[in-house]
Amino acid sequence: MTTIVSVRRNGHVVIGGDGQVTLGNTVMKGNAKKVRRLYNNKVIAGFAGGTADAFTLFELFERKLEMHQGHLTKAAVELAKDWRTDRMLRKLEALLAVADETASLIITGNGDVVQPEDDLIAIGSGGPYAQSAARALLENTELGARDIVEKSLSIAGDICIYTNRFQTIEELTY
């Protein structure tokens, strides 16, 4: 799996991910980029799960963003509906973390679109470790969103065997 973390603080939203790709119990690649910009660089997104599945979902999500003129929540709900009801899409195994200047969302194949209360997202095998670290840093420091994401990913990379310390980080300022 992987670790994807998103933090929103002081006019910045950041999504970061590690770079490890595994096949069974073998590391196949250590520098995969699981976070990217979409819709004219106005949306950032990260994935946990199957790489090919995630690329398919990124393409579909970008189409939904274009259909809904960049409205993140509408595009996310439409993607989740298609993902849940389409026979072929239902087989895709991934989770998406997406964010723009207004919202941070988790999109699942079960048709769920979740906006966390504190705008903190952590998904993938290292998600619980990264979430714990990020929450502690949010509550007890004045660190910026990017620093919190970097430190949370590093901690998850030290603990989770399916997460490494290579990081891809994207940030939006609003």
UniProtKB/Swiss-Prot annotation:
Pfam families, per database record: Proteasome
Keyword Cytoplasm found: yes
GO-annotated biological processes: proteolysis involved in protein catabolic process
Protein origin, superkingdom: Bacteria
EC number(s) on file: 3.4.25.2
Regulation: Allosterically activated by HslU binding.
Protein's UniProt keywords contain Cell wall biogenesis/degradation: no
Residues that bind Na(+): G157, C160, T163
Positions of the catalytic residues: T2
Recorded catalytic activity of this chain's protein: ATP-dependent cleavage of peptide bonds with broad specificity
Subcellular location: Cytoplasm
One GO MF term: metal ion binding
Entry GO terms, CC: HslUV protease complex; proteasome core complex
UniProt entry keywords in alphabetical sequence: Allosteric enzyme, Cytoplasm, Hydrolase, Metal-binding, Protease, Sodium, Stress response, Threonine protease
Function: Protease subunit of a proteasome-like degradation complex believed to be a general protein degrading machinery.
Similarity remark: Belongs to the peptidase T1B family. HslV subfamily.
Subunit organization: A double ring-shaped homohexamer of HslV is capped on each side by a ring-shaped HslU homohexamer. The assembly of the HslU/HslV complex is dependent on binding of ATP.
PANTHER family (alphabetical): ATP-DEPENDENT PROTEASE SUBUNIT HSLV, METALLOPROTEASE TLDD
Name under which the protein is recorded: ATP-dependent protease subunit HslV
Annotated organism of origin: Yersinia enterocolitica serotype O:8 / biotype 1B (strain NCTC 13174 / 8081)
Gene expressing this chain: hslV
